[in-house]
Regions:
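A short acidic, often aromatic-flanked loop/helix-cap motif at beta-alpha or helix-coil junctions
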Residues: 35-41, 97-104, 174
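RecA-like P-loop NTPase motor core
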Residues: 1-58
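Activity-critical C-terminal alpha-helical subdomain
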Residues: 66-161
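Short coil/loop linkers at secondary-structure junctions
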Residues: 20-24, 89, 162
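Nucleic-acid enzyme cleavage-core boundary/entry regions
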Residues: 6-13, 17, 44-51, 149-201
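Hydrophobic, Leu/Ile/Phe/Ala-enriched alpha-helical segments that form helix-helix packing faces
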Residues: 17-22, 79-84, 112, 196-200
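Structural beta-sheet core signal
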Residues: 59-61, 94
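Short acidic, S/G/P-rich loop/turn micro-motifs used as interaction or catalytic elements
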Residues: 6-8, 64-68
Length: 201
C-alpha cells in the first residue's frame, strides 16, 4: 500500500474492510511510503520474492488529482510504463474506484456516517467555505484549507469517546469497524471490494 507504515488511516481502513468482507483471507501489507517508491529496488525485490513463492501481489495507491499534477490517467500510464521498464507485472487498484481521480481519503469520506453526523459535516464545510473565501488585497487566500485527511481526522476527534478509544487515533486507527462512524457497505466501496475479491488468495 502507498502508506508510510501500519500506523496510518489507510492501513486501518483496508484492514477493517478485509476483516469484515474477507475474513478467511491472510493478507500481509507492505507499506511503500509513497507511490514514488513502488519501483525502488527494495520493493521490486519483495514483489519478485513473493511472486516466486506463489504469493499474490497487489498494489493499492492513490490516483490523485490534476491539482496534485497527477490523476487517474497519468498515474495508470506511469505504473504501466514502469512495469514494462522493470519487467514486472501485478494487478493494481487506484483509489478511489480504479477509474476516477482521487485518493483513499475520497473513499473514507464516502463511508463516513454523514447521515448520523450531519451537523459536524455541515459546520465543517461552512468553515471550509469561510476560510477559503478569505483573501488578501491581491486576491490570494490568507489561510490554508484543511485537506480531506485533516477533515476526517477532525471528524473522529470531535466524537465524544472514551480515552481508550481516542488513544487509537494516534496510530491511524479511526475506528473504521464502528458502524456509528463508518458505513463500509456504501456503494462507493464496491469497486475496491470487487478488486479484492478477484485478487486476494
Amino acid at each position: 500500500i502507498e502508506a508510510k507504515d501500519k500506523k496510518t488511516s489507510e492501513y486501518h481502513f483496508l484492514e477493517a474492510i478485509i476483516r469484515l468482507f474477507f475474513p478467511g483471507k491472510e493478507v500481509d501489507f507492505i507499506c511503500m511510503n509513497g507511490i514514488g517508491n513502488l519501483f525502488n529496488e527494495t520493493n521490486l525485490n519483495q514483489i519478485s520474492l513473493a511472486q516466486e513463492s506463489g504469493e499474490q501481489v497487489i498494489v493499492l495507491a492513490d490516483a490523485d488529482t490534476i491539482a496534485k499534477r497527477q490523476g487517474y490517467a497519468q498515474r495508470k500510464a506511469e505504473i504501466e510504463n514502469d512495469m514494462v521498464t522493470h519487467a514486472v507485472s501485478f494487478p493494481y487498484f487506484l483509489y478511489p474506484n480504479n477509474q476516477d481521480d482521487g485518493d483513499v481519503e475520497t473513499l473514507m469520506e464516502s463511508a463516513a456516517r454523514r447521515d448520523l453526523h450531519t451537523v459536524f459535516f455541515d459546520c465543517f464545510e461552512d468553515y471550509e467555505k469561510c476560510v477559503s473565501g478569505t483573501k488578501d488585497e491581491s486576491g490570494n487566500p490568507i489561510y490554508n484549507v484543511p485537506d480531506l485527511k485533516s477533515k476526517l481526522n477532525t471528524y473522529m476527534r470531535a466524537q465524544k469517546l472514551p480515552r481508550k478509544l481516542r488513544d487509537r487515533f494516534g496510530s491511524g486507527d479511526w475506528l473504521f469497524d464502528n458502524a456509528d462512524y463508518w458505513n463500509l457497505n456504501v456503494a462507493t466501496l464496491l469497486p475496491l471490494k470487487e478488486f479484492l475479491a478477484m485478487w486476494l488468495k
